[in-house]
Amino acid sequence: MINNNKWLVVGLITSCHGINGQLKVKSLSDFEERFLKPGIRWLQKENEPPSKIELTSGFKQPGKETFIIKLQGINNRNQAERLKKCKILVKTNKLPKLKKEEFHLLELINLEVKTLENEELKIIGKVINLENEKNNLLVVELFKNKKKVLIPFVKEIVPLVDIKNNFLIINPPNGLLDL
């Protein structure tokens, strides 16, 4: 998610791993090197400004979308516990360059969700989050009842994404939006 037009949240620290200060991170990014390649990262605790920290190592957990990372100065479980729920950020001006029709998945958050009904576009909700354990899923809050539905982010169901105009169009199969 884009945070104050300056930061992009690329990961969430979910828990500790072991006793030597390693951290488990849920990735919100398509760029694995953010959690593998040593270097400077930014960490944000709730309601605090981001702070600089150095990633010393990282690896992807086999078969999962989570990473185990080691940060400089975090050497035991007690220190690691204090970082649970922290966000890992990158500056938006440091995002990798994409091709013309490409976009960062996190740019989908807060887009209006529209459907085509009787040749007319109808706004039905907005993207409030992403789930990406195995496949990318849009978490959409429906305006009519405030319920949350998961929409598979595949071309057949989401044929159009218009970042510039802040919306996407879905073509849901029967029953997908029924709650």
UniProtKB/Swiss-Prot annotation:
Cysteine-cysteine disulfides: none
Residue span, PRC barrel domain: 100-176
Gene3D superfamilies linked: PRC-barrel domain, RimM
One GO molecular-function entry: ribosome binding
Pfam short name (any one): RimM
Subcellular location: Cytoplasm
A cellular component term, taken from the record's GO annotations: cytoplasm
Xref: InterPro entries: PRC_barrel-like_sf, PRC_RimM, RimM, RimM_N, RimM_N_sf, Transl_B-barrel_sf
GO-annotated biological processes: ribosomal small subunit biogenesis; rRNA processing
Statement: the UniProt record of this protein carries the keyword Repeat: no
Highest taxon of source: Bacteria
Keywords for the protein's UniProt record, in alphabetical order: Chaperone, Cytoplasm, Ribosome biogenesis, rRNA processing
Homology family: Belongs to the RimM family.
Subunit (UniProt): Binds ribosomal protein uS19.
Function, in words: An accessory protein needed during the final step in the assembly of 30S ribosomal subunit, possibly for assembly of the head region. Essential for efficient processing of 16S rRNA. May be needed both before and after RbfA during the maturation of 16S rRNA. It has affinity for free ribosomal 30S subunits but not for 70S ribosomes.
NCBIfam families to which the protein is assigned, alphabetical: 16S_RimM (TIGR02273)
UniProt comment concerning the protein's domains: The PRC barrel domain binds ribosomal protein uS19.
UniProt protein name: Ribosome maturation factor RimM
Organism listed in the record: Prochlorococcus marinus (strain MIT 9312)
Lineage: Bacteria, Bacillati, Cyanobacteriota, Cyanophyceae, Synechococcales
